[in-house]
From Swiss-Prot:
One BP annotation, GO: 3,4-dihydroxybenzoate biosynthetic process
Family: Belongs to the type-I 3-dehydroquinase family.
Catalytic activity, EC: 4.2.1.10
Gene: aroD
Protein name: 3-dehydroquinate dehydratase
Subunit structure: Homodimer.
Keyword Glycosyltransferase: no
Organism of provenance: Syntrophobacter fumaroxidans (strain DSM 10017 / MPOB)
Molecular function GO labels: 3-dehydroquinate dehydratase activity
Reaction(s) catalysed by this chain's protein: 3-dehydroquinate = 3-dehydroshikimate + H2O
Enzyme class: lyase
Keyword flag Lyase: yes
Length: 234
C-alpha cells in the first residue's frame, strides 16, 4: 500500500451486512469507518453480532467503529445506554478504533480509553463554522479528553471557514501535541478534505462509489486517490 492510500478512510454506510467483506478489504485505502448506525439490525443483538462477524476477516483494513446518535444526525434511534453497549461490543469484537462524541461524560469515555481500541473524539457542527477563538477553545476541550486523535468537522458557508478550521491542525499539534483531523463539510468545504492531509491530518474520509456519503462533500475513493497523485502526496 502506498503512503497516499494509507491516508484514505472509506466510510461504510450500508443498511445491509451483505458483501461487507468487499468494503472491509477495498483496495486503495488504509482504513474503514464503519457507520454501524446505518445498519437495519443495529438495534438488535443478533443484527449487530451478524455485522461484527466481519471483524474476524483476516485481510481486512483497520476499522473505526462509529454508532452516531440522532443528535449528531446519525441513524441510531435507541437509548444512549443501548448505543454505548453496542460500542462496547464492537470493541470486544476487535475494532481497532472507536469514534466517540465529545459530549459524552467522563464515566463513559474512560472505559474506552482503557480498552484495546484507539479513540477518536469527534465534534461536528452541521450548521456552520464558528469564529477562530471558539474553534480553538473546542480543540482545547477535546485535547483534555485523552483521545489518540481529535476530529472537528464543521459546515463551510464561505471559503474563509475552511481556513479557520484547517489552522486547527497545526494549532493542536503545537499547543497540545494532538493529532487532529479538521475539515469542512458541504460543497464549499469540499477542498478542505484534501487540504487537511497536506496540513498534517492522519487521514481523510471518502465515500465508496456504490454507497451514500456519510457527510456532505465527500469525494469518492478514486477521486481522492487522483487528487493525492496530482499534489504528489505519498
Amino acid at each position: 500500500m502506498s503512503l497516499a492510500h494509507s491516508l484514505i478512510c472509506g466510510c461504510l454506510m450500508r443498511e445491509s451486512t451483505e458483501d461487507t467483506a468487499r468494503f472491509l478489504e477495498y483496495p486503495g485505502i488504509g482504513l474503514v469507518e464503519w457507520r454501524l448506525d446505518a445498519l437495519h439490525g443495529i438495534h438488535t443483538r443478533n443484527g449487530l453480532d451478524e455485522a461484527l462477524a466481519g471483524l474476524s476477516l483476516p485481510g481486512r483494513h483497520p476499522v473505526i467503529a462509529t454508532v452516531r446518535p440522532e443528535r449528531f444526525r446519525g441513524g441510531f434511534r435507541g437509548t444512549e445506554e443501548a448505543r454505548i453497549r453496542a460500542l462496547e461490543r464492537t470493541v470486544r469484537a476487535g475494532a481497532e478504533w472507536i469514534d466517540l462524541e465529545d459530549d459524552l461524560p467522563e464515566d463513559v469515555l474512560s472505559p474506552f480509553r482503557d480498552s484495546a481500541a484507539r479513540v477518536v473524539i469527534s465534534h461536528h457542527d452541521f450548521d456552520g463554522t464558528p469564529a477562530s477563538d471558539p474553534l480553538k477553545h473546542r480543540v482545547e476541550h477535546l485535547a483534555t479528553l485523552g483521545a489518540h486523535v481529535l476530529k472537528i468537522a464543521t459546515y463551510a458557508r464561505t471559503v474563509e471557514d475552511n481556513l479557520r478550521v484547517l489552522e486547527l491542525i497545526p494549532f493542536a499539534r503545537k499547543q497540545f501535541g494532538a493529532e487532529t483531523i479538521a475539515f469542512c463539510m458541504g460543497p464549499t468545504g469540499r477542498w478542505s478534505r484534501l487540504a487537511c492531509l497536506l496540513m498534517g491530518s492522519p487521514w481523510t474520509y471518502v465515500r465508496f462509489p456504490e454507497l451514500p456519503a456519510s457527510a456532505p462533500g465527500q469525494f469518492t475513493v478514486a477521486q481522492m486517490q487522483t487528487l493525492l497523485e496530482i499534489v504528489g502526496a505519498g
